[in-house]
């Protein structure tokens, strides 16, 4: 029985899942919008939202925590210099999921996950092609 077990397995072992969400979180912070499956997008929210909340208060300890979770210095810099100040007054809900139909190969439901209030110039990056 899987009572009280949170999170999705996504047919991966735990280290693969952790690496995948670490990479997807870095891509989302870097590009501010990515295209992925609906299930991965919903699970990615649980990774990215706490990172942005952490970035709202800039300190060395918080930067080290963010680096431990993303392992990307460029992403940590953007989190604390751009995204933290941008969402200073917003109490959560930093991401938006927009469903965009089915994938051509296997009919998997696809979605864009984007940061709310992003500049309109940012273009979507297809995460499936990057993997």
From Swiss-Prot:
Cellular component GO terms, alphabetical: cytosolic large ribosomal subunit
Oligomeric form and interacting partners: Part of the 50S ribosomal subunit. Contacts protein L32.
Origin: domain of life: Bacteria
Source organism (scientific name): Shewanella oneidensis (strain ATCC 700550 / JCM 31522 / CIP 106686 / LMG 19005 / NCIMB 14063 / MR-1)
SUPFAM superfamilies in UniProt: Prokaryotic ribosomal protein L17 (SSF64263)
Keyword Ribosomal protein assigned: yes
PANTHER family recorded: LARGE RIBOSOMAL SUBUNIT PROTEIN BL17M (PTHR14413:SF16), RIBOSOMAL PROTEIN L17 (PTHR14413)
InterPro entries per UniProt: Ribosomal_bL17 (IPR000456), Ribosomal_bL17_CS (IPR047859), Ribosomal_bL17_sf (IPR036373)
Gene3D superfamilies: Ribosomal protein L17 (3.90.1030.10)
Protein's name according to its UniProt entry: Large ribosomal subunit protein bL17
GO molecular-function terms, A-Z: structural constituent of ribosome
GO biological process: translation
Keywords: Ribonucleoprotein, Ribosomal protein
Cell division keyword on record: no
Family (UniProt): Belongs to the bacterial ribosomal protein bL17 family.
């Amino acid at each position: 029985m899987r009572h009280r077990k949170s999170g999705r397995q996504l047919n991966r072992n735990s280290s693969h899942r952790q690496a995948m969400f670490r990479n997807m979180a870095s891509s989302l912070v870097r590009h501010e919008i990515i295209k992925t499956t609906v299930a991965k997008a919903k699970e990615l929210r649980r990774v990215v939202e706490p990172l942005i909340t952490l970035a709202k208060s800039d300190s060395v300890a918080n930067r080290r925590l963010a680096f431990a979770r993303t392992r990307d210095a460029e992403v940590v810099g953007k989190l604390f210099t751009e995204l933290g100040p941008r969402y200073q007054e917003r109490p959560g809900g930093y991401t938006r999921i927009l469903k965009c139909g089915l994938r051509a190969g296997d009919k998997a439901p696809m979605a864009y996950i984007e940061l709310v209030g992003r500049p309109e110039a940012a273009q979507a990056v297809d995460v499936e092609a990057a993997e």
